[in-house]
């Protein structure tokens, strides 16, 4: 007896969100998303990435309470020349810290302004070309701060290791053929 079984598994939102940023950075068409098995966070990031190039004059992108989109888009928009956008979200999103990521991006010359409480969204970002020099994040409040920088090609040093940082490194390496992280517990390089 021959039996065939097809299972439609949901995609990994951790992988899909990273790939969406990498695709946008490299000018590739964004992964198609379906309404049936694509997590809401992935659809939200996909839609934001499609809209951002069309925006200007500080128009807002509402990211609900999606921390991944807020962190990854903060880095993405900061390095996107000509981008002029406000990233915002729910009241809960405006209580989620993002100061370490903004500080690291500002060290590279990013033009990011807090629209409310210092260290928290909403953020007004005016994108420009950023240098690819190393930054350090000590005890990051979120490994996504490190991943956001890695995704835009910024070398990072930190005192932590994480499977999510390792996943980002692997995806960047596979996507761009660059090794941007060394698991030495402290060094990430391009």
State what each model feature region is.
Residues 1-190:
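Structural preference for solvent-exposed beta-strand-turn elements
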């Amino acid at each position: 007896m021959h039996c065939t079984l097809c299972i439609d598994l949901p995609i990994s939102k951790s992988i899909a969100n990273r790939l969406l940023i990498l695709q946008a950075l490299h000018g590739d068409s964004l992964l198609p998303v379906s309404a049936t098995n694509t997590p809401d966070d992935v659809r939200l990031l996909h839609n934001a990435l499609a809209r951002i190039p069309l925006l200007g004059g500080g128009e807002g992108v509402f990211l609900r309470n999606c921390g991944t989109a807020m962190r990854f888009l903060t880095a993405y928009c900061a390095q996107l020349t000509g981008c002029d956008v406000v990233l915002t979200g729910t009241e809960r999103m405006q209580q989620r810290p993002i100061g370490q990521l903004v500080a690291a991006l500002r060290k590279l010359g990013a033009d990011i302004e807090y629209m409310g409480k210092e260290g928290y969204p909403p953020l007004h970002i005016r994108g420009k070309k950023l240098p690819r020099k190393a930054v350090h994040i000590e005890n990051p409040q979120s490994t996504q701060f490190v991943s956001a920088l890695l995704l835009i090609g910024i070398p990072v040093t930190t005192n932590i290791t994480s499977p999510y940082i390792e996943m980002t490194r692997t995806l960047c390496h596979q996507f761009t053929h660059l090794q941007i992280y060394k698991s030495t517990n402290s060094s990430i390089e391009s």
